[in-house]
Amino acid sequence: MDLFALLRAGVRSGDTPDIGGSTDDRWRELYTAASSQGVSALVWDGIRRLPPESQPSRELRLRWAYNVERIERRYGQQRRRAAELAAAYAEAGIRTVVLKGLAVSRLYPVPEHRPCGDLDCFLCGDYERGNRVAEQVGAEVKRDFYKHSHIVFRGLTVENHRFCTAVRGSRRAKRFERHLQRLLAEGPL
């Protein structure tokens, strides 16, 4: 049983994993590996493409499905909190660009199955004003990092990036950063 075959089937619509039979012990190992790597929901999507006789035991399927439900609920909560914070930024006239995390999940067949730990955003030159707006809506803001602040808003962790890239110590990165910021200033991507 190959974790990568199941993962591939989970993220590529139409793929059916070519997997032989597997023991309960091997299925438990796969469950543990998928969970520890943060891909259990994606692997679950691959398992659901297997014929019933090739799937894990009912007990493990129920456990796996419950875990996937938790991931889906957390994703929904993250989306709602992100929308609330983005609305507060928009109301303050701050343009928000999502850099990764939740935005990347939209590229998956089932976005809710691509877990993310936080939301990374760039506020198009309004870094500090964005921090103040976040505080005004009840978020905790830590400004201890050169590249971004850490915002915790109703359970959602947000990295408000001062820069799109890591610019320290590299002229090339600084030039690239200026180029990206000019593109963002021109309007929607």
Task: State what each model feature region is.
Residues 1-117, 123-189:
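Conserved NTP-donor binding/palm subdomain of two-metal-ion nucleotidyltransferases/polymerases, i.e.
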